[in-house]
Amino acid sequence: MHSTRNKQLKKLKSWHKNKKAMPAVLASTLLMAAHAQAAETTGADTMIVSANAGESVTAPLKGIVAKESASGTKTSTPLIKTPQSVTVVTRDQMDAQAVSSVSDALNYSSGVVTNYRGSSNRNDEVIARGFRYAPKFLDGLSYGLSGQGSTIGKMNPWLLERVEMVHGPASVLYGQVNPGGLISMTSKRPTAETIRKVQFSAGNQHLGEAAFDFGGALNDDKTLLYRLDGIASTKHEFVKDSKQERIAVAPSLTWLPNPDTSFTLLTSYQNDPKAGYRNFLPKIGTVVEASAGYIPYDLNVSDPNYNQSKREQGSIGYNLDHSFNDVFSFQQNVRYTQLREKYKYLVYTKNADAPATDTTILRRPQKEENEISEFAIDNQLKATFATGSVNHTVLSGLDYKWLTLEKKMWLDRNNDYSFNWANPTYNVSVNDSMLTELSTNERNKLNQVGVYLQDQLEWNQWNLLLSGRHDWSRVDKQDYAADTTTERNDGKFTGRAGLLYAFDNGISPYVSYSTSFEPNLDSGAPGTPAFKPTTGEQKEVGVKFQPKGSNTLLTVSLFDITQKNITSYNSVTRYNEQIGKVKSKGVETEAHTQLTPEISLMAAYSYTDAVTKESYTASQVNKAPSSIPRHAASAWGSYSFHNGPLKGVTLGTGVRYIGSTYGDNAESFKVPAYTLFDAMARYELGSLASQLKGAAVQLNVNNLTDKHYVASCGGDTACFYGSGRTVVATVSYSW
């Protein structure tokens, strides 16, 4: 084993000089996996095989309180013993709150800003600890594109078992991650227990939705398991004459050839023939009242007859687990993903040379095409053993990914398509032949290899976490618009050290230090060379509290993060720019508790002080980046009646507060704070009649008071209204 691993490391080091070594590296890891499957051992069962080995981090979990997670350490570890802040959103929480996006799932989490583009959030964009575009990972591997200046891809939450937020740097295990944190998504997996569920929803905004979830064993000895999830939905957006339509399906299959081996095939396909629209609005008329008042809440800046938005994405991969014996186990995750997006619209633009009033919007036609192809593989060898009185969980890994991003954008800068938002006129004739300026036409390719080593040491009540990783990355940029080709090679070591002491009373104080590294695929103006990778570091102290035998977890953390080479989107030029260094420090508190069998509560508060410390634009230095609230808070509670005339009824309510934010990176204006209220009522119809067991009805109302507000601004030409009241009625049946 050691000689094989040494050969892999030698091949890895030579890759930076010769990429032809990569097939050999991958071949050797696949041979290791094949050997693992064929080996006959008597080790402990894998997570899927054994349902009694404790809480599974991939299987269904009842309630809103998770006690274990693998996202922070890549090993199933109790959260109370993890020296890092991790938020877990369970399937039950997502169902109770009727979330329609991964961003929605994190609405009640600390340290994150979700849906800051309001109803124009066409992708899952999340700000974490003051840093934009928290990257998304699906089943341990990167999914879609999440860089400092852009994000592409949107996963339907119905296909997921849980969504987790790892707060702070996680590059030491995952590689391409910014220091704010990452979003870890876990697919619904096959189970030996039979799952049969259908669900239908309807609501305002012409919502119509049908979903199903089936799973179970395909043979008598339960060595073949399956899961099949799917959803179809259609709804109108709050922007006039703009729609979202979606069909998504995720078949998966697990094979258990022996008690020590499991192989799970994971696939998904999603087609959004109408993928939504990003509705840029001016500051005048949204944040500041114009001469004619405020811009109507449902104003469509573009033209419904011209708009076009499509998204298609699919993936196929597998998870292989094998236990050699009581000490060694091996896991391999592999996935190939492809994603395509097409958009066409009239976008609000600012042109100082064109005549305008505070009610006139100047627009230009714009067309975008994005395509991502990504392959990722992660090989993990785990050893659990003791040296004297010290218990070790050692994880060594080798991962590789390549990602190709092709971007095209056509513009027509003549600005002939203007209208008065106080008296808008639509159905304009747009001449697509005038879209002759190919402002962006490029192909970016990332190759990244990483090796990592981690040791989780436990001695009495002390828990020490030590991790180290080295990455080699290459970014090739072919800029067809500027007729240039650039290549950038980088290598970086990242590390993490965390120390936690678990008191008998359930209090666990901890301290940690970690660094981050992220190759950059963001695009600047034509002719701009490949951006430098970002680097970051974080210092964190915190305390967790989980009373023995309780279903409660409370976390308080203080963090201090610095990131260099960060990029930002310029709302005037419509290009990304590498602005320099940002420092963010703050406090996060979060609590999840099943107080009694009837009462569940969650609450969160965060204070974030983010400041640009270095920038080529002098007016941005020592100023807060846009869209980041200093204060944010939320709370959700529910009560379930188990007896009496209201037996089967669950009532829930929540409140979300987002503090004021700056509207640009120079602090030239502010966007007011806002508070939103949510509510839920559910009735298990089996309490009414035994024949209705498994049937339920549920009503969810978000933004209960239908508050109209500005979610954020990214400049005086890039403001976004928030979503209005949404009402969703759901009927479900499980049998």
Swiss-Prot record:
It is a multi-pass membrane protein. The keyword Transmembrane applies. It comes from the Bacteria. Gene3D superfamilies: TonB-dependent receptor, beta-barrel domain, TonB-dependent receptor, plug domain. Residues 78-188 form the TBDR plug domain. The keyword Transport applies. Residues 55-82, 117-124, 178, 203-221, 270-285, 321-327, 352-377, 401-402, 433-447, 470-494, 518-537, 561-567, 608-648, 684-695, 716-726 are extracellular. Residues 193-735 form the TBDR beta-barrel domain. A motif (TonB C-terminal box) lies at residues 718-735. The chain crosses the membrane at residues 46-54, 83-91, 108-116, 125-132, 169-177, 179-187, 194-202, 222-230, 261-269, 286-294, 312-320, 328-336, 343-351, 378-386, 392-400, 403-411, 424-432, 448-456, 461-469, 495-503, 509-517, 538-546, 552-560, 568-576, 599-607, 649-657, 674-683, 696-704, 707-715, 727-735. Residues 1-38 form the signal peptide. InterPro entries: Plug_dom, Plug_dom_sf, TonB-dep_rcpt-like, TonB-dep_rcpt_b-brl, TonB_box_CS, TonB_rcpt_b-brl_sf, TonB_sidphr_rcpt. It is found in: Cell outer membrane. One of its GO terms (cellular component) is cell outer membrane. Residues 39-45, 92-107, 133-168, 188-193, 231-260, 295-311, 337-342, 387-391, 412-423, 457-460, 504-508, 547-551, 577-598, 658-673, 705-706 are periplasmic. CDD domains: ligand_gated_channel. GO terms for molecular function: siderophore uptake transmembrane transporter activity; signaling receptor activity. Keywords: Cell outer membrane, Ion transport, Iron, Iron transport, Membrane, Receptor, Signal, TonB box, Transmembrane, Transmembrane beta strand, Transport. A motif (TonB box) lies at residues 45-52. Involved in the initial step of iron uptake by binding chrysobactin, an iron chelatin siderophore that allows the bacteria to extract iron from the environment. Belongs to the TonB-dependent receptor family. This is Ferrichrysobactin receptor. It comes from Dickeya dadantii (strain 3937) (Erwinia chrysanthemi (strain 3937)). The lineage of its organism: Bacteria, Pseudomonadati, Pseudomonadota, Gammaproteobacteria, Enterobacterales. The gene is fct.
